[in-house]
Amino acid sequence: MGFKYLKIKNPKVILTEWIPFGKNYMTEFIDRITLKEYQRKRIKYFTASERRDIRYKAVFETSEYQTTVNIIEFIPETSVKFTAEIIGERKKDVFIYVDYLGRCIYSSEITKAGDEEEIVSLDNLSFVIPDLILDSSRIMSHLISPPQRYLLETLYGEIKVYKHVTVLTETVVNIDENTILEISQVIGAVKNIIEIDDGLIIFGDFGIFISHKNPEKFEKFIYYYPFIRSITGVSRDLFFKLNNIASKLEVISNTLASGVDLEDITEIRGELSRIDRELAVIEIVCGYLKEIVEFLNSSYPPNFGDFDLMILEKVEAERKLRRLIYRIAEIENILKSNDSLATSLTRLLTTISEDLERKIANQLAENTKYQVAIGEAMEVLEIGIFGVYALEAAHILLLTSGKDEILHHIKILGFPLEFWIILVVTILGVYVGKIVIEYRKKKVLGE
């Protein structure tokens, strides 16, 4: 950046993207932004501002700024056109068109960029476009339904930053090395240049730059062709997402093959759950894309004039649509493969988890038996100790009493009386020890 060779007069920036819609979502979307949904629910959904110009208009709060939506026209279940006023550092009016195919077009005339007005450099324009992309994403993220928002956030995160950029200007541009560098700032690396009716269409990685004395002539082309490129971009995103998922599944497969513990199983189960959700979203999005691509192919060429059809022929729109059919088929195959692998790994993980849990349960059972055996042995030992204490006590008592000689001469069943005294005391000590240990066990178990 830093070049300021090329300046253009009041450029129009048109952003095109695809959002999953369909006629049901389209009906709900139109009801929402025309306030019919809120009128049915008897909810007041108008601004409380005293400003007369916006007092009775729909105002949607998006993040740090408000958006005033003014409906231009709509066709039930099909399409809607409206403007959205973005109130922020730079107040901008954005024209928005949405139809049931999911074609979302945002258009804004840039009258000021940086310190320049009316005639602005592409260097300054390149700073305005990202703001417009983020603003339009915030608006649409707020207006679409939660299921649509979930699909987009699963694929792109909180904010979808990719949109196809078209820059339209009536300024005549002479192509040279410097102008190509400037133009690449707003549409990406220049890939192709087509001369059309004393004008230029310059194609970049992520956008188109159109220079023509009568730029309105390209309205239908801008309506049609950037949408094809947007769908192509979404298909590339699905490929990237599926390849990323395939890499994750490969890592999981290798991890399971090398052996896992319970902590690993919990982590892998969470990862497989996230992958399953992503695959479900990709399947839904792929279904939308398939219907759209089939419709565009079956209705080609569109009902345009000779000029627009000539441009579409030059850019090989029909061939690109046919190629999209094959790409969608490839996505379906990869999706099926990933889904099958994810299912197999989930089953394998369940089997490994059950085996590991069974081993742990068996080990715990063995440990429990071992602990019980040790406990029982300790009880016997403690009881025996009580008996030994009683034996020693009786023996000491007899020795200190001085009557052991007398008792020695008194015999019962051939054994001295002192033997029977020691035996009875020992048995009594063992019994007392057993009673004490049983009491302690009951007390501990009770606690």
UniProtKB/Swiss-Prot annotation:
It is found in: Cell membrane. One of its GO terms (cellular component) is plasma membrane. It comes from the Archaea. Keywords: Cell membrane, Membrane, Transmembrane, Transmembrane helix. The chain crosses the membrane at residues 380-400, 412-432. It is a multi-pass membrane protein. This is Uncharacterized protein MJ1566.
